[in-house]
Design a protein with these regions (language model features):
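A short, surface-exposed alpha-helical micro-motif characterized by mixed small hydrophobic
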Residues: 190-192
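H-loop/switch region of ABC-family ATPase nucleotide-binding domains
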Residues: 184-185
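Conserved ABC ATPase "signature" region
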Residues: 5-10, 91, 103-120
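Conserved ABC ATPase "signature" C-loop
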Residues: 202-203, 218
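The feature captures the beta-strand-to-loop junction immediately N-terminal to the Walker
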Residues: 39-41
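Pre-NBD coupling/linker segments of ABC/ABC-like ATPases
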Residues: 1-22, 212-221
């Protein structure tokens, strides 16, 4: 009733707010085997775009077509059950990524070895440090033989030795016919991994070209 609305209005104010679109009018095609760096400042829409590609979030309009097994190094510890052991979480996350238990069992030794968690793999993940969880998440994602690898600054996991190990592993994966989408703030890392570069600003792609051209554009405009 109007009386009730007036009464509620005495205690609760309606705060106007603006709607912000994280990604706007995007038209992008990435071919199989391409390695694409995505450059842009914080808030440019880079991570949102990757989350839409992986199905973590969905666009309010338009369509996304993904053809291949996607492994995403975005939020490395998402999908873990804190009460499960590390080994049990390997199977849990493997199933989430579309693998069956037989396939996961074949990959399990390599995952544990790469994560350097042999002594802790049968302990609950809630007892792990954040670094241990990230190492396990990274190891699962890079050892499932992905066809599409999506990386969002995930190579900063752990200490220097483990970061170097992660970088080497990603380069090794790229020797196969995989597609790479790589969000980074570092031109050096972008050049090391990618041949094509995209620059984003305010949710839009403002440049798309070779990696050298994209880095020059980003350095000049930002």
């Amino acid at each position: 009733t109007s009386s009730r609305r007036r009464l509620l209005g005495l205690f609760f104010k309606s705060v106007p707010h603006k709607t912000k679109h994280a990604v706007v009018d995007m038209n992008l095609t990435v071919e199989r085997g391409e390695a694409v760096a995505i450059l842009g400042r914080n808030g440019a829409g880079k991570s949102t775009m990757l989350k839409m590609i992986t199905g973590v979030t969905f666009p309010t309009s338009g369509e996304i077509y993904v053809n291949g097994i996607v492994s995403a190094l975005l939020e490395l510890t998402s999908g873990f059950d804190q009460e499960f052991t590390g080994r049990e979480n390997i199977y849990l996350k493997g199933r989430i990524l579309g693998l069956n238990d037989e396939d996961i069992a074949k990959l399990e030794p390599a995952i544990i070895d790469f994560a350097e968690l042999e002594e802790y793999i049968d302990q609950p993940v809630r007892t792990y440090s954040s670094g241990m969880k990230a190492r396990l998440g990274f190891s699962i994602c890079v050892n499932i033989n992905p066809e599409i690898l999506i990386v969002d600054e995930a190579l900063s996991v752990g200490d220097r030795a483990f970061r170097d190990k992660c970088t080497k592993k990603v380069k090794e994966i790229m020797q196969g016919d995989i597609t790479l989408l790589f969000v980074t703030h570092s031109p050096e890392i972008a050049k090391a991994f990618c041949t094509r570069g995209i620059v984003m600003k305010n949710g839009k792609i403002v440049f798309d070209g070779t990696i050298d051209e994209a880095i020059d554009y980003y350095a000049t405009k930002y």
